[in-house]
Amino acid sequence: MKKKVIGLCMALFLLIFLFTPASQAATRFIRMFSGPEGGSWYPLGAAMMQIVENNIKGVSTSNGPGGGVGNCKAIQRGQADLGWTYTHTSFNAFNGKGKFDKKCDKLRHLMSLYPGVFQMAVPRDSDIHSVADLHDKRIVPGKVGFTGTAIAELVLKAYGITFDSIKKEGGTVNFVGYADAAALMKDGHIDCYMAVTSCPQATIIDLNFRPGVRFLGVDEEHMKKIHEMEPGLMPTVIPKTAYKGMTEDVPTVGTVTEIVASADLPDDLAYEIVKTLYAHWDDLKKVKKKAIEDSDPQKALLGVRIPVHPGAMRYYKEKGIKMD
């Protein structure tokens, strides 16, 4: 009897030993870094990863908060497989320019999404009417590692302003996320909230309710200076239909939201991810309708300035989607 029990235990042990590693090996873990809560990236990233996990056999996923600059660096370090960024940011990352002191040469384009619009909101009743007026004010350009923070720094530079010069003149620069920025403006602790996001943005809609906001524009002279410093940024507008109370379009700069992948992501898996996401495009509209409606699958290669992942390119060739 004792020998029979020992034999059964050994058989069970062998079954566990033989089959558990095989099942674990069959699971491929995909890590995505998207954006902060309060924006479009985080909820859409979470929805995308859930779609991938539910529809691609043997794949497990996660979606974490991040920023356009930091996400590129995370992929280069092998900490992420997929990341949200902007086309001009990925170009700088790939080439080691701007905020990147080293080349992120593992970056590959997966898909272009909707336009990212740089928005500078100030309280409606403030005496701030130009970017130049921010030289001694209290601002929130975003968190360190956010693409919006880098663009804010660039726009201010075109007007002869730096984060350091603001502080020297008695102003403050608060590197906080969307939710904290909204709280600071509602409490009267900041004068300008900056972000590059879809338009309209939930945080600004909230701020437009209280205290009420208006937007600072970028004039043609300074638009040219910005383009000289960063050719990847393009002139665009905050349309007058974006937020209640607007009476005219506001000129600003913009870019294209992009999902990038690691060159180490297997081609077949990249193909399946792109194919699966586009097959469930209507499901993503339930999360952020306006953002996804502005993300035309036929423009999946819009603004691309880095190599396209071979797996993604295979899908685009099948669908007849060509480079912009």
Language model features with spans:
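Bacterial N-terminal signal peptides that target proteins for export
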Residues: 1-10
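C-terminal segment of classical bacterial N-terminal signal peptides
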Residues: 15-24
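Bilobed "Venus flytrap"/periplasmic-binding protein-like clamshell domains
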Residues: 29-61, 116-187, 302, 306-311
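Acidic, polar ligand-binding/catalytic clefts
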Residues: 80-114, 198-202
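Ligand-binding clefts/hinges and TM-proximal coupling segments of bilobed small-molecule sensing domains
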Residues: 137-155, 233-304
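An extracytoplasmic/periplasmic, membrane-proximal ligand-sensing/linker region
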Residues: 180, 186-187, 192, 197-215, ...
